[in-house]
């Protein structure tokens, strides 16, 4: 699996370099779920596909920007699912964005998830790699990823990152969010899931939520590319996840590779509070 991780690092570095002079315009294409693709979405996906295709340990890749699974080597063991550029719609305002990767063994399912990674393209290039414990790495002047620290969640945080159009929230979710603000939580929502999860991890706690809404009853975030890998990282850091019913997002099973789900990630206190509010 270390070989797979090393190729992901190469792809991340190439995307980071390309971001220095990006084309932020939209293409004429849409991805499987109907999102209009930025030209840089397509470029990033191409960089990752090209790089991972050189790794003999990868059986197949699944991209948010591809309709189907792409088989690379049927004799290999690992399947890599990825969002090539999470938060790409924020490129024109120069917000921090990132790439998300999940490494599955033999079959793409939460129970077969062996490692998860994400990169942050911000003021500096950082990479979080998680097998047993999330570890933060930072690119140095020699183009090497240097270990910075292990990432751990506190039992309770102060950050509230909540998505979904408010007018479409269910009443129970609106009440829950209000209760957090009543406790003094700070709103920290950028519109890039990877950036918001990264802030919660590095600050040690809080909650990220993207609930079921009237216009998206199954949520909008994709299980295999976004939800499972970030849930894996949060839980390995000592945090909790749920879809509002299950006690872990990693308990969920889906047949379709572009399946979506409501999702909540956070410290133990916030997730316990949410489950109580949702199931009263």
From Swiss-Prot:
Give the metabolic or biological pathway. Answer: Carbohydrate biosynthesis; gluconeogenesis
EC nos: 3.1.3.11
Question: Whose protein is this, by species?
Answer: Campylobacter jejuni subsp. jejuni serotype O:6 (strain 81116 / NCTC 11828)
Chief subcellular location: cytoplasm
Q: Which GO terms describe its biological process?
A: fructose 1,6-bisphosphate metabolic process; fructose 6-phosphate metabolic process; fructose metabolic process; gluconeogenesis; sucrose biosynthetic process
Q: Which residues bind Mg(2+) 1?
A: 64, 83, 85
Write out the residues that bind substrate: 86-89, 189, 220
Instruction: Alphabetically list the UniProt keywords.
Output: Carbohydrate metabolism, Cytoplasm, Hydrolase, Magnesium, Metal-binding
Query: What protein name does the entry list?
Result: Fructose-1,6-bisphosphatase class 1
According to its UniProt record, this protein's enzyme class is: hydrolase
Binding residues for Mg(2+) 2, per the UniProt record? 83, 86, 226
User: What note does UniProt attach to the cofactor annotation?
Assistant: Binds 2 magnesium ions per subunit.
Instruction: Give the lineage.
Output: Bacteria, Pseudomonadati, Campylobacterota, Epsilonproteobacteria, Campylobacterales
| Reactions performed catalytically | beta-D-fructose 1,6-bisphosphate + H2O = beta-D-fructose 6-phosphate + phosphate
Question: Self-association or partners: how does it assemble?
Answer: Homotetramer.
Question: Does the entry annotate any disulfide bonds, and if so which pairs?
Answer: none
Any one GO MF term held by the record is: fructose 1,6-bisphosphate 1-phosphatase activity
- What superkingdom does the record give? Bacteria
Subcellular compartments: Cytoplasm
